[in-house]
């Protein structure tokens, strides 16, 4: 009788039970492959085992990083001249998912009463790709920061230039870098935080222009994708050759900072590099 009451379910029954579990209940870390309940991600949305920062919406990053934030240029979006139906459908979906009109959220934030110009790229907005409107928003942010003598903190998370916009997308690399150079010439601080993923034209331009370059643990940082590199050099690169940790070993990143420590670290850096502390 006991055997019948505690009989192991069949394979088919187990599959049915697993299928009944909602997808969002369990998560698997793409880095260490640990499996855990979604609630263990916590407020910062990080792996409880290895500290990998899962990709998050730009608006969520604002909430966990800044004391106050006022958005600017929120109505700038993809120009109407791009009429491809598939592209317009992707734009509509991205707007619905993120609540943003473009792949970057810009504004003025504060950390411990220190004002800072903020740019946050959203990986859920067509992979945070760099389009003409993205470049315009970031350029305006740097121009505003230069006029107001503000430091800039930029969180990059992007698949690179947005190919649907062709040369107009690629032009944004030079356009933004020019605005960064003017900001730097004014003696103002620019901090970059490389998030997963930071690749392509963003890596080749303003993501590596910072005075201080931070990164989140295990973030993918590179230019070309692994398959492109393998086909070009006819070799298999190391598994972690584009991880933030490897990139830091080669001198391109100053420090890797856990997401839970990011607010504190940025606050300290801004305080140390204000003109009063640096020159007063």
From Swiss-Prot:
- Pfam families, alphabetically? Carboxyl_trans
- GO cellular component terms? acetyl-CoA carboxylase complex
Q: In which pathway does it act?
A: Lipid metabolism; malonyl-CoA biosynthesis; malonyl-CoA from acetyl-CoA: step 1/1
Top-level class of the enzyme under EC nomenclature: transferase
The record describes how the cofactor is bound as: Binds 1 zinc ion per subunit.
Asked if the keyword Zinc belongs to this entry, the reply reads yes
Give the primary localization class. cytoplasm
For this protein, what is the EC number? Answer: 2.1.3.15
Where does the UniProt annotation locate this protein? Cytoplasm
Instruction: Could you list this entry's UniProt keywords, alphabetically sorted.
Output: ATP-binding, Cytoplasm, Fatty acid biosynthesis, Fatty acid metabolism, Lipid biosynthesis, Lipid metabolism, Metal-binding, Nucleotide-binding, Transferase, Zinc, Zinc-finger
According to the UniProt entry, its GO molecular function terms are:
acetyl-CoA carboxylase activity; ATP binding; carboxyl- or carbamoyltransferase activity; zinc ion binding
Q: Where are the zinc fingers (C4-type)?
A: 29-50
List the cofactors: Zn(2+)
Query: Can you state which reaction this protein catalyses?
Result: N(6)-carboxybiotinyl-L-lysyl-[protein] + acetyl-CoA = N(6)-biotinyl-L-lysyl-[protein] + malonyl-CoA
Q: Which InterPro entries does this entry report, sorted A to Z?
A: AcCoA_carboxyl_beta, Acetyl_CoA_COase_Trfase_b_su, ClpP/crotonase-like_dom_sf, COA_CT_N
Query: Is ATP-binding one of the keywords?
Result: yes
So where does Zn(2+) get bound? Answer: 29, 32, 47, 50
Stretches assigned to the CoA carboxyltransferase N-terminal domain: 25-280
Quick one: a GO biological-process term for this protein?
malonyl-CoA biosynthetic process
Q: What is annotated about its quaternary structure and interactions?
A: Acetyl-CoA carboxylase is a heterohexamer composed of biotin carboxyl carrier protein (AccB), biotin carboxylase (AccC) and two subunits each of ACCase subunit alpha (AccA) and ACCase subunit beta (AccD).
State the function annotated in the UniProt record: Component of the acetyl coenzyme A carboxylase (ACC) complex. Biotin carboxylase (BC) catalyzes the carboxylation of biotin on its carrier protein (BCCP) and then the CO(2) group is transferred by the transcarboxylase to acetyl-CoA to form malonyl-CoA.
- Family listed: Belongs to the AccD/PCCB family.
Q: What is this protein called?
A: Acetyl-coenzyme A carboxylase carboxyl transferase subunit beta
């Amino acid at each position: 009788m006991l055997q019948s009451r505690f009989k192991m379910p069949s394979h088919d029954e187990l599959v049915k039970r697993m299928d009944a579990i909602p997808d969002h209940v369990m998560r698997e870390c793409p880095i260490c492959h640990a499996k855990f309940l979604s609630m263990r991600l916590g407020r910062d949305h990080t792996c409880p085992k290895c500290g990998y920062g899962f990709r998050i919406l730009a608006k969520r990053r604002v909430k966990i990083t800044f004391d106050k934030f006022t958005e600017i240029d929120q109505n700038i979006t993809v120009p109407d001249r791009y009429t491809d139906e598939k592209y317009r459908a992707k734009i509509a979906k991205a707007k619905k998912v993120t609540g943003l009109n473009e792949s970057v959220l810009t504004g003025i934030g504060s950390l411990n009463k220190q004002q800072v110009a903020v740019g946050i790229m959203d990986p859920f907005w067509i992979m945070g790709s760099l389009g003409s409107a993205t470049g315009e928003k970031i350029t305006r942010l740097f121009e505003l920061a230069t006029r107001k003598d503000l430091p800039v903190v930029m969180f990059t998370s992007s698949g690179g230039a947005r190919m649907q916009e062709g040369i107009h997308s690629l032009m944004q690399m030079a356009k933004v870098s020019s605005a960064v150079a003017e900001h730097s010439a004014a003696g103002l601080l620019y901090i970059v935080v490389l998030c997963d993923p930071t690749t392509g034209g963003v890596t080749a331009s303003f993501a590596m222009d910072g005075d201080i370059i931070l990164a989140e643990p295990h973030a993918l940082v590179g230019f070309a994708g692994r398959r492109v590199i393998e086909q070009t050099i006819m070799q298999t690169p190391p598994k972690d050759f584009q991880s933030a940790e490897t990139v830091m070993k080669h001198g391109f990143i100053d420090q890797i900072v856990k997401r839970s420590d990011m607010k504190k670290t940025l606050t300290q850096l801004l305080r140390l590099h204000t003109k009063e502390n640096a020159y007063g």
